[in-house]
Amino acid sequence: MSIAVGLSACALSSVLFGSMFVPVKKCHSGNGIFVQWIMSTAILLVGIVVYSTQGFPEFEPLAMLGGMFWALGNATAVPIMNTIGIGMGMLVWGTTNCVAGWAAGRFGLFGINSTVPEYPFLNYFGLVLVVFGGFLFSQIRPNEPQTASERSPLMVAPDDDLTDDVAPDDSDIVVPRGGAVPTRAHRNQKRLLAIITSLVAGVFYGFTFVPVIYIQDHPEIYPTAPKTGLGYVFSHYIGIFCTASALMIGYVIYSRNNPFASSRLVGPSMTAGSMWGIAQASWFVANDNLSQAVSFPIISMVPGVIAALWSVFYFRDISGSRNLRLLSIAVAITLIGAICVGVSK
């Protein structure tokens, strides 16, 4: 029964993680700081509901650190998504997410108990496949982002007035008033920066559970700590809300009280936050019923596959025989690697 519950939680978590940015992607979302702050309020509301269903267990301040890690990584999600698409973004950061989570458990980083795999060769072989799959993901060249909202004059700063001129060899690019056209080299630089940022974000995501695992591994230090994963959800989500609020305050100060904060983003961001809150709670349930060694590789990689399906069939971020062939091969290799890592333990 516990296996069925764990696998069901993995499935729910993967679908929600892989689909949560779809509502936001359809809107012009700026730099994503406002989006994340609205998401964090919805996440906190979900956390309050979970907290009440668990009988208001003891609050664990250390678990807030995991929420901070996630919020720092997620602060880059919208710019990444707007540059290389939700599918490629999630697949790339899912790779380092999986590797970071593997390293923390395998070597006992940050004071948690190390987990020695029963089949070391299979474990390392799976890790190599995950890394190689991540390399293949980086070779995919997504289409230039195109949304109607991004072209709307209402969404453009006064200094960025646009004309109807069109680049002769790239009809998708609107030419600024001065006539300058983004060069291919410039687009490649943005793409490379987005990939590097995705890799760094994945590391933050990979360490999200470390504080909770540390508490669970040291009952002598935390004798009254919750016994189940859901007992840490509220503490975890408070960390997210506080970090997102700090980033929002810093952004308001930096922009001199002129942040990008469109009212059109409130509904989609609340939806994304609610989906993430439920998905993360499901991940805690999966950890309790399957162990993190099994659930982590699944939930760190499958959402990227689901997001890639959105990119291919809905947003059309990824098209062309070369890209689709690379995507299919990379997904297959990465999933096989993640399965090997999970089975080896």
Swiss-Prot record:
Any GO MF annotation of the entry: carbohydrate transmembrane transporter activity
Cited InterPro entries: Sugar_transport, TMEM144
Record keywords: Membrane, Transmembrane, Transmembrane helix
Record's subcellular location: Membrane
Example of a GO cellular component annotation carried by this entry: membrane
Principal location listed in the UniProt entry: membrane
Bilayer topology term: Multi-pass membrane protein
Domain of life: Eukaryota
Bilayer-spanning residue ranges: 3-23, 32-52, 61-81, 84-104, 120-140, 193-213, 233-253, 265-285, 293-313, 324-344
Family: Belongs to the TMEM144 family.
Protein name as it appears in the record: Transmembrane protein 144 homolog
Lineage: Eukaryota, Metazoa, Ecdysozoa, Nematoda, Chromadorea
